[in-house]
Design a protein with these regions (language model features):
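Compact, glycine/acidic-enriched structural inserts
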Residues: 107-168
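Short connector loops/turns at beta-strand edges and beta->alpha or beta->beta junctions
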Residues: 18, 108-110, 190
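Charge-rich, acidic-biased intrinsically disordered regions
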Residues: 49-75, 227-242
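Active-site acidic/histidine clusters and adjacent loop/turn architecture
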Residues: 14-69
Length: 257
């Protein structure tokens, strides 16, 4: 597939970064639709056909995957109203959109980030994942040391505890994974890479390599949700909420959502 992004995509995002203003954007929204949002929707449609071949558990649908350009500034010191990148995430079909691990793509004025994982999971999710890692660390190790994973994204990384998590011994064979508070794997490129003929093939290669990690991370969260769905009482016809939201995020240096 030829990349749907073009030099006009990057030119628009760079101009938006210099003019992060609602009035400026309103006057140029047709160009945004043509050169930024439209190409991403085209990409998501193609991924909707290709993703099920290796990640049938994940969603690629513009109604779910595409992030809005407008920022929520209510609790932020940064009052810039608009995001200066275009991004999409590919969450689990078995979890709410804002929960769990997924794949992620971002095209920004100076960079492209392709990868996935779990950026800022709530502590309840971290505990579930740690228990899953402790019981299945060999499976995780096989994923993140596999040839396709290492060649595509290098290593599993993220913020981690300086010591041993509560409830685990210091000589646990999976300690390096148990200390993680984030679970991230991805690769960064120059922004212009998004416009090349190699872009889509590389996107698929990285997504294919990271998808087993996403599936591993989501397994305990899906099981937990199924378990509480069976036991939680109904209130006004709806299940009581069980967890705070978590969502896929790129490394801190990669984006400001």
């Amino acid at each position: 597939m030829t990349s749907p992004f073009s030099r006009k995509t990057l030119a628009y995002l760079r101009a938006l970064k210099r003019n992060n203003d609602r009035n400026w954007f309103k006057l140029r929204k047709p160009q945004y639709e043509e050169h930024v949002r439209g190409p991403m929707v085209t990409l998501l449609a193609q991924l909707g056909a290709d993703l099920p071949r290796f990640a049938p558990d994940l969603i690629s649908d513009p109604r779910v995957s595409l992030y809005r350009i407008y920022r929520d500034t209510r609790f932020s010191h940064d009052k810039a109203p608009l995001k200066t990148h275009v991004a999409a995430h590919f969450p689990s079909k078995d979890l709410p959109r804002k929960e769990g691990a997924g794949l992620y793509l971002e095209v920004a004025p100076t960079r492209v980030w392709i990868g996935g994982g779990l950026y800022m999971p709530p502590s309840a999710d971290v505990r579930l994942i740690r228990a899953h890692v402790a019981a299945n660390h060999r499976a995780l190790h096989r994923i993140v040391t596999g040839t396709s994973f290492r060649r595509a994204v290098g290593t599993l990384h993220g913020d981690r505890l300086s010591g041993t998590p509560r409830g685990y011994v210091k000589d646990h064979p999976a300690l390096e994974y148990l200390r993680l508070k984030q679970f991230l794997a991805g690769r960064e490129f120059e922004a212009e890479f998004a416009t090349t003929n190699r872009f889509y093939a590389e996107l698929l290669r990285i997504f294919r390599a990271v998808a087993p990690l996403v599936r591993f991370l989501n397994a305990p969260l899906i099981e937990h949700r199924r378990r509480i769905t069976r036991i939680l009482p109904l209130q006004d016809g709806a299940l009581l909420p069980d967890r705070r939201r978590s969502e896929v995020r790129p490394p801190a240096a990669a984006s400001r959502w």
